[in-house]
Every structure is written in structure tokens, then in C-alpha cells.
Amino acid sequence: DLANFLNCLGARVRGAGTDVIKIEGVDSLGGCLRYAVIPDRIEAGTFMVAAAATRGDVVLENVIPRHLEPLIAKLREAGVEVGEEEDRVRVRASGPLSPIDIKTMPYPGFPTDMQSQMMALLSTVPGTSVIVENIFENRFKVADELKRMGARIKVEGRLAVVEGVERLQGACVRATDLRAGAALVVAGLMAEGETRIDNVQYIDRGYFNLEQKLRMLGARIWRAPYDEKTPAQDNAVRKSALI
């Protein structure tokens, strides 16, 4: 998409989406008055996983299904119904789900930015699921927070083994990064009781009005101010929480 935008401005960029990108310099850029940025596949994917986790029925519009193919394939493998149209997808999950294995890979493989949300989903799927993180190190910090909610997850290096439990329990948890925060929101939607997620400034980096969009789908979620008398953990800057 960046290459398309630059070419719209008069740049000469070839090979976008391949292993080799060739750029020929030009004197100046300009002339592209309007450009529509492609939809965020990770935001769309997060809503898809949330729909599956809550056994919901959700239609997402203004998406590019082919950008979501790795996630769609894994959701279907787990037993989730995913219908595709030109610019929308429908996610339905009414029956029992099955455990799956996931390996993160560079695009067009399964995105590392979706494995935390899938870990939350798989935490209540009966059986054993395995997640292998091939992109980044220390990408499983959310596992400790999910375990506060009753999840059974064992992490060894780049490998996480998820043993599905019947139900998660609401708890006070902390977002350690952007995608971990999104995963905890998914977990909170599934859990019995109230879940409080601190450090939501991480979530705000990648999701605009997340709680409002979820409320439109029927979720009971709101943003609450911190009690200033409570000391911040690890000197983190904490301004609000999602409940």
C-alpha cells in the first residue's frame, strides 16, 4: 500500500509484495490529491477472533478478505464459520471449537500480531493447541496475564502450549503491549465476571474507540479512570482502564 501511495505521488517503486523492491529516484513527489489507505487487517482480525471467542455472529465491512486468508484458514480449522464477500466477512461460531496449531510467519503467513488474540480464544477450546512464534522473541507475555484468569498455558522459548479450560474467570490484568491488550479484551469478553485491564494506553496505539465499537455489538465494556491513590506498577504511565 505504501508503494502504491508513493507511485500515486509520482515515485517509481516496483516489486512491492515480493522479496525484492526496486526504487528509481525521481526529482520530486506530488500530484496525488486523495488516497484511500487499505483497511487494517489486524483490527479486523481482532474483531473476528472476538466474535468467535464469544460464539457470536458478526459482519465486518470495509475489509479485504485476501489479506485475512491465514487467519480465516485457522478460524475455519478450529470450527468457526467464515463467509467471504468482496469487501466484507461474516464470522459465526455457534458450536464447539477444536484445538489447532499456529506458526507465525511473515506475510502472507499467519501474522504475529494475531497470535495473542488467538491464544485467548484457544484458552477455552477443549484439547491442546500449540503456538510457535517465529517472528519476535518474548512475544508471549500475555500468557501470564491469561493465567491470572484461569488459562492453562505453558511457555518454552518460542513455543506456547495451550490446554483449553472450560471457562475463564474475570480478574485484574495488565496490558504489556498492544496485541496483548487486545487479547485481554477478547479474554474479558469470554470470562465469567468482571475483568479490569490496566495500561490501556497500549491498546489505544492500535485501536480507535475499541470499547465503543464493541458496545455496538452488545459487549458490556467501558473506560474507567484509575484510582490515583493506587501506585502504578513498574512505573508505567496508566491513565484509564477497560472493564
Swiss-Prot record:
Pfam families according to UniProt: EPSP_synthase
One cellular component term from this protein's GO annotations in UniProt: cytoplasm
Q: Can you state which reaction this protein catalyses?
A: phosphoenolpyruvate + UDP-N-acetyl-alpha-D-glucosamine = UDP-N-acetyl-3-O-(1-carboxyvinyl)-alpha-D-glucosamine + phosphate
Listed binding positions for UDP-N-acetyl-alpha-D-glucosamine are: 113, 135
Q: Which GO terms describe its molecular function?
A: UDP-N-acetylglucosamine 1-carboxyvinyltransferase activity
| Keyword Cell division among record annotations | yes
Per the UniProt entry, the Enzyme Commission number(s) are 2.5.1.7
Q: Where in the cell is it found?
A: Cytoplasm
Keyword terms, alphabetized: Cell cycle, Cell division, Cell shape, Cell wall biogenesis/degradation, Cytoplasm, Peptidoglycan synthesis, Transferase
Sorted alphabetically, which InterPro entries does this protein's record hold?
A: Enolpyruvate_Tfrase_dom (IPR001986), Enolpyruvate_Tfrase_sf (IPR036968), MurA_subfamily (IPR050068), RNA3'P_cycl/enolpyr_Trfase_a/b (IPR013792)
Q: Mention one GO biological process in which this protein takes part, according to its record.
A: peptidoglycan biosynthetic process
Q: In which pathway does it act?
A: Cell wall biogenesis; peptidoglycan biosynthesis
Q: Quick check: keyword Cell division in the entry?
A: yes
What task does this protein carry out? Cell wall formation. Adds enolpyruvyl to UDP-N-acetylglucosamine.
UniProt record similarity statement: Belongs to the EPSP synthase family. MurA subfamily.
Report what the protein is called.
UDP-N-acetylglucosamine 1-carboxyvinyltransferase
Q: Which organism is it from?
A: Desulfofundulus thermocisternus
Gene (name only): murA
